[in-house]
């Protein structure tokens, strides 16, 4: 895992808790070792199942904004539950790194 993530573990936990995150995963170039100064960070998220659709939307965009502020990089955030492509889902499941689990 990249040092940028390791250095911010405590703050990341606080962000996840305040945004009703059940699980947060890192994937992509940050996991594969191909991260460059211009790379974005790729995250997949599972939110608490108790959220209403409106609360889910608010939490999604709040989490994205908080992650971008924390890491000073563009963030690609996807909701893990909506991944439909079986090839992408298999690759995601093989490579993802769990950063937070409630």
Name these PLM-found stretches.
Residues 44-46:
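Short hydrophobic/aromatic beta-strand micro-patches
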Residues 1-25, 31-33, 37, 50-102:
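Catalytic core of pol beta-like nucleotidyltransferases
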